[in-house]
C-alpha cells in the first residue's frame, strides 16, 4: 500500500509540473515604466525646455498609453498637456518616435489625427529599458515639435543610466 501511495504521489507531482507551462499563458508579465521614473522624466523634460526659454508640458505614459506622470510649466498653455499626451500615445501606438512616424506615414496623418487620443506631431519619444519599450514621453509648447522632441530626448539622456537599469533582464 505504501509503495502505491509513493508511486501515486510521484505521478501526481509529475502531472502537476507538466501542466504548469500550459497554465503560464494565463498570466502575462509586462515591463512598464514606474511612477517615480515617469515623474522624473516629465520633470527633466520641462526643465530642459525651461532652460531654453520654452514653457511646455510633458506627459509620460506607460506601454499601454496610460498616463503615469504629467507636468505643466507655470506659464505653459493648458492645451499643451492634452497635446503632449496625444503625442506620447502616438509613440506608444507606433513604437516609433512621433516625428519619425510623421515623416514615414504622411498618407495616414489626417485619419490618425481624427482618432481620439492621438495626434501626428513631433514631440513624442519612446522610452526603452533593457530592450523593452516601457513607455513614451510627449512634450508640447516649444515653438516647433523638433524643439519639443529635443527636450524629451535631453531628459531621457540625463536619466539614461537609471532608465537602462530599470528593467532586470
Where do the protein language model's features map onto the residues?
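Bacterial N-terminal signal peptides that target proteins for export
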Residues: 1-10
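Hydrophobic alpha-helical segments of integral membrane proteins
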Residues: 13-15
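N-terminal signal peptide c-region/cleavage motif recognized by signal peptidases
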Residues: 19-21
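Flexible, solvent-exposed loop/hinge segments and secondary-structure transition points
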Residues: 24-169
Amino acid at each position: 500500500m505504501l509503495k502505491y501511495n509513493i508511486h501515486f504521489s510521484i505521478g501526481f507531482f509529475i502531472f502537476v509540473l507538466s501542466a504548469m507551462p500550459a497554465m503560464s499563458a494565463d498570466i502575462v508579465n509586462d515591463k512598464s515604466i514606474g511612477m517615480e521614473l515617469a515623474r522624473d522624466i516629465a520633470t527633466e523634460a520641462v526643465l530642459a525646455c525651461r532652460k531654453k526659454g520654452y514653457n511646455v508640458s510633458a506627459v509620460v505614459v506607460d506601454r499601454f498609453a496610460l498616463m503615469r506622470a504629467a507636468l505643466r510649466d507655470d506659464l505653459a498653455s493648458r492645451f499643451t498637456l492634452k497635446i503632449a499626451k496625444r503625442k506620447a500615445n502616438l509613440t506608444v501606438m507606433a513604437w516609433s518616435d512621433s516625428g519619425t512616424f510623421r515623416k514615414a506615414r504622411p498618407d495616414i496623418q489626417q485619419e490618425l489625427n481624427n482618432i481620439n487620443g492621438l495626434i501626428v506631431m513631433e514631440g513624442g519619444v519612446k522610452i526603452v529599458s533593457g530592450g523593452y519599450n516601457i513607455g513614451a514621453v510627449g512634450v508640447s509648447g516649444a515653438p516647433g515639435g523638433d524643439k519639443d522632441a529635443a527636450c524629451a530626448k535631453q531628459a531621457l539622456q540625463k536619466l539614461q543610466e537609471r532608465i537602462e537599469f530599470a528593467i532586470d533582464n
